[in-house]
Each structure stands twice: as C-alpha cells, then as structure tokens.
C-alpha cells in the first residue's frame, strides 16, 4: 500500500551545453518540474515533468503542467491510498489530456512502489535486459558541424544516429551524411514539418537507406500518414501522433506507420507506455524509447522502460554529458561500448544529488495531506 503524505515540486532552470535546433524551435534553456513524493512510511520517489516552455511539441507547457498539478492532480493524489502505480492514472482519468503533468506525478509513485518491493524499476515494469543500446540525436546546424558531431558520437559508440530535418534541409543533407557515413544506422526526424503534397520530396529519401522517417506530417494527420507510408519504402515512425494506446491501435489498424516511438511523458506515464508496448508486441510493431532533453531522472526511467522485450531499436537514450555539464542524479547516465546498463538497484536506480539540484532550483511548492 502506498499513501502519499507529501509532494514537493522543484522548479528547475538548466542551460544546455549548446543550443539544440529542430525544424520548429531552438532550445538553450531547459525548464523542468521535478516531483518529489514521500509516502507515509517515509519512502521517497522522484518524477520529472518534461514539457517544454512553449507549446511547440505538444499543447502542454511547463506553465500548464504546473497549473494542472497544483490545482487538480496533486490534491487528488496526496492522502490517497494506492495498491499499484497503475491506479494513479485511473484516479486522474476524469481530467482530460495534460499527459506530461500526469506522467511526472505517476513516475514518482512508480519509484516508491519499486523501492518498497525491493526491486528495480525495470523489474517492476517487466524488463528483460541488463543493458540497452544507446542512440543520439543531432540537431540542425551547418553541415560541417553536423558531420563532426556525428563522427564524435560514432567514436563514442552510439549505435544509432538521428538527425533533424526540415524542408530545405533534407535530401541534400541526408545525401551528404550518407556519403560520409555509408553504413551508420541513420534516421531522420521531421517534427511534423511536411505536408502530403511533399510526397515526391520525401520519396527521394528512399535512396539513402534510412532506418525510418519520424513524424513527417502533422500529429493529427494519421490518415495522411497512411497514404504517405503506402508510397514510401522507408518506414514511417510516429511520435507526436501517438498519445495513447488507442492512438497506437488506430495507427496499426490503418497502416499509418511501421514503427512507434514511445515516450512515457508524451503518453501520460509508464502505465500507458506499457499498454502501448504490449499492443505493439501483439501486432509485431517495432518500438523504441524516445527522449525529451531530460535530466537523469527521466533518463533512468527511460532506460528501465527500454529494457522491455519489444524495444528492438536503439532509443534516444544518451549519456548525461550529451546535454548537461552536470546532471542532477548520481550516478549519471553513461554509455559503455554503445550500451547503457539497466540498474538493478531498487527503484529508479539513481539518487537525486540535492547539492547539485539546488544550483538550478528557482522555486519550490510543497503539498501535504493537511494543506
């Protein structure tokens, strides 16, 4: 039994080591809400709200998440008894959407649950691997800079490279990278920057043996993705289009993609992520675990999730040093010969370094059973 006695929200502001650009936004500063939940037996769990500051990825932002957590979700969870973390999303189901806010809260309860059971989060989720392959993302930049970055990551052992593309920086960019790295596992992420009328342009990418094209069309264009996939040899991977197991079911039934990116934050938490994983396993749909420029709290969670059997493609799970001069967890997330070890320690398997985190905390909100 888990009864949450106290929740603290830490508002963090951290600077990336260098700006990260995609087809929509350039990111330098990253804001987070870190969730610390303590149950009545004194066990602490950690979660992370990974929404961005502006609604370029989904409609959620750090600001909207804060509102939903303070005014609706946390009052609904504090003082309530849960037998299992999957009961948390059930308790919040009457509130529509706001999945990233829900995910941050639920993940803290998963951490508590695993710690009380004396098992790793990976084991609690049903993971079967002791290490997961590491992949990395390269943002849009001048070609020479991107080539140098890819070469550096290849030397570090990353098993898959994802590049961002957009109209005007696509076919020639991929061609140049393929010319330099003819055999490297390579995929392209469009972040919804194309329309169905661009089909001939996207078909040109078939010549470069990409693992996949991620989210070429708008998030709600699931039918258009079906039409596009029929004309492409390259597999389409859906990201923003998949926010629930029902979205995944529709995409599978329509044939809108061949691969699905599962991000716990995007789909509302680990419980929904497990449902999507199991559905994809049933339908032999490949999946991989995406990332969102997160701290080690979410990275540790993603490593645990990616240890499940249907995660057959290296995910966006890179070392802490990819984005941060220092992470807020110990040990930080590191790759070794192209893999990240799955922790066997109870819970997330990492500890929040309070001394480091305090450097980046701008505000705190505390919630208890008695207000």
UniProtKB/Swiss-Prot annotation:
Query: Gene3D superfamilies from the xrefs?
Result: Enolase-like C-terminal domain (3.20.20.120), Enolase-like, N-terminal domain (3.30.390.10)
Q: Which UniProt keywords apply?
A: Lyase, Magnesium, Menaquinone biosynthesis, Metal-binding
Which species is listed as the source? Answer: Bacillus subtilis (strain 168)
Cite the NCBIfam families for this sequence: menC_lowGC_arch (TIGR01928)
EC number assigned by the record: 4.2.1.113
Q: Could you name the active-site residues?
A: 164 (proton donor), 263 (proton acceptor)
UniProt function note: Converts 2-succinyl-6-hydroxy-2,4-cyclohexadiene-1-carboxylate (SHCHC) to 2-succinylbenzoate (OSB). Does not show detectable N-acylamino acid racemase (NAAAR) activity with N-acetyl-S-methionine as substrate.
One annotated GO molecular function: magnesium ion binding
Q: Name one Pfam family in it.
A: MR_MLE_N
Q: Which PANTHER family match?
A: O-SUCCINYLBENZOATE SYNTHASE (PTHR48073:SF5), O-SUCCINYLBENZOATE SYNTHASE-RELATED (PTHR48073)
| Entry similarity comment | Belongs to the mandelate racemase/muconate lactonizing enzyme family. MenC type 2 subfamily.
Q: Which CDD domains match?
A: NAAAR (cd03317)
The answer, when asked if Ribonucleoprotein is one of the entry's keywords, is no
**Could you tell me which pathway this protein works in?**
Quinol/quinone metabolism; 1,4-dihydroxy-2-naphthoate biosynthesis; 1,4-dihydroxy-2-naphthoate from chorismate: step 4/7; Quinol/quinone metabolism; menaquinone biosynthesis
Name this protein carries in UniProt: o-succinylbenzoate synthase
Source organism superkingdom:
Bacteria
């Amino acid at each position: 039994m888990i009864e949450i006695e106290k929740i603290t929200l830490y508002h963090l502001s951290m600077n990336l080591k260098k700006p990260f650009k995609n087809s929509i936004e350039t990111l330098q500063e990253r804001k987070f809400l870190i969730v610390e939940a303590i149950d009545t037996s004194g066990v602490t769990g950690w979660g992370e709200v990974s929404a961005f500051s502006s609604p370029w990825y989904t409609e959620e932002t750090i600001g909207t998440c804060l509102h939903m957590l303070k005014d609706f979700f946390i009052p609904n969870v504090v003082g309530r008894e849960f037998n299992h973390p999957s009961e948390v999303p059930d308790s919040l189901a009457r509130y529509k959407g706001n999945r990233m806010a829900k995910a941050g809260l639920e993940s803290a309860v998963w951490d508590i649950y695993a710690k009380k059971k004396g098992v790793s989060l990976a084991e609690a989720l049903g993971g079967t691997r002791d290490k997961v392959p590491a992949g990395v993302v390269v943002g849009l930049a001048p070609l020479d800079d991107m080539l140098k970055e890819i070469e550096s990551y290849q030397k570090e052992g990353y098993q898959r490279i994802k590049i961002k593309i957009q109209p005007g920086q696509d076919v020639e960019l991929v061609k140049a990278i393929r010319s330099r790295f003819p055999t490297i596992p390579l995929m392209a992420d469009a972040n919804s920057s194309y329309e169905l009328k661009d089909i001939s342009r996207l078909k040109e990418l078939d010549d470069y043996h990409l693992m996949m094209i991620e989210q070429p069309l708008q998030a709600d264009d699931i039918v258009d993705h079906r039409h596009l996939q029929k004309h492409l040899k390259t597999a389409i991977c859906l990201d923003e289009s998949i926010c629930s197991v029902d979205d995944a079911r529709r995409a599978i039934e329509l044939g809108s993609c061949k691969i699905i990116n599962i991000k716990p934050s995007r789909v509302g938490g680990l419980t929904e992520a497990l449902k999507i994983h199991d559905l994809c396993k049933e339908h032999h749909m490949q999946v991989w675990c995406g990332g969102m420029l997160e701290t080690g709290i979410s990275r540790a969670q993603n490593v645990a999730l990616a240890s499940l059997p249907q995660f057959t493609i290296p995910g966006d799970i890179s070392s802490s040093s990819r984005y941060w001069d220092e992470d807020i967890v110990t040990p930080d997330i590191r790759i070794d010969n192209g893999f990240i070890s799955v922790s066997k320690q109870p819970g997330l398997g990492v500890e929040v370094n309070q001394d480091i985190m305090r450097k980046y905390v701008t505000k705190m909100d505390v919630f208890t059973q008695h207000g």
